[in-house]
Amino acid sequence: MDSISQNDWLKAKIRKRDISYQSARGRRALRGVALIYLTVLLLIPLFVIIQDGLREGLTGLWHQVTLPIAWNALMLTLRTATIMTIINSIMGTLTAYALVRYDFRGKTLINSLVDLPLAIPTLVTGVMLVILFGPQQALGALLKEQFGISIIFAPPGIILALLFITFPFVVRAVQPVLLDLDRTQEDAATTLGAGSWTIFRRITLPPLILPVTSGALLSFARAIGEFGAVVIVAGNIPLYSQTAAVYVLGEVESENRLGASAVSIVMIAIAFGLMMLVDWLQHRKN
């Protein structure tokens, strides 16, 4: 009897070891597939463009980046992305607050429309803005004649396109936090006579700082590389409305691969730094 029990115990132990070995082998295979995919899809292209941009060293890269047209394109990209980020951080937070805290007719439709910019091709976004604000259109002509504001083929058009494309990021970053927020303190503050603005500023807003910042950084990173809508609305005018992404296309078409790679490296570095910061903020929030 004892011999049978011992044999069963040994068989069970062997089966458990085999299952554990197969599971470990499966995990290693899965990791290997993921690493190979990541290497082919992301790391090799990054390595190639960095190697190409640095083939004349840091001095050559700096020379290409500081050329007047390239530098102006980078600065315009950063300026328009910054303005867009400030506006969308405010409006995205207010939109998320309205969608979470208030019930109104058409709320479901508006909540669905928030994600529409992510689904629409950015070229279509550019065409819509040209049709609406073009110099030959009623609204575009009115803004130009009455206020001296040009939207299309000018920096304001770039900002408008970026506002449309990146609008969902802050809204979707803030909404889950508002949904999970305990409203006990807000109710207590209301009972004690605090006004709605005081409650929002002192109680509701502080927990939203991290998600708003994360959404803002994602918006900024997305805006840096935007091409489709910008190339339609900006007009690609050097030293005026040419962004970094459009400049890179021009350098590729001019067969100046070094210039295209150099500016691309700067854009990649900025985007990567922002993504690292977003990950850090997410980790801190969790």
Please place each PLM-identified region on the residue numbering:
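Periplasmic/extracellular loop-to-transmembrane helix junction in inner-membrane transport proteins
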Residues: 16-28, 49-86, 101-102, 251-257
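Transmembrane alpha-helices
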Residues: 32-37, 116, 120, 164-183, ...
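Hydrophobic alpha-helical transmembrane segments of multipass integral membrane proteins
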Residues: 40, 75, 79-91, 95, ...
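Short, Lys/Arg-rich, polar N-terminal cytosolic tail immediately upstream
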Residues: 1-24
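Interhelical loop and adjacent transmembrane-helix boundary motif
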Residues: 24-27, 61, 68, 230-276, ...
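Membrane-interfacial helix termini and adjacent extracytoplasmic/periplasmic loops
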Residues: 16-21, 58-66, 71, 107, ...
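C-terminal transmembrane helix and the adjacent membrane-cytosol boundary/short C-terminal tail
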Residues: 2-9, 29-33, 44, 48, ...
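Transmembrane-helix boundary motif in ABC transporter permease subunits
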Residues: 18-22, 83-115, 127-131, 142, ...
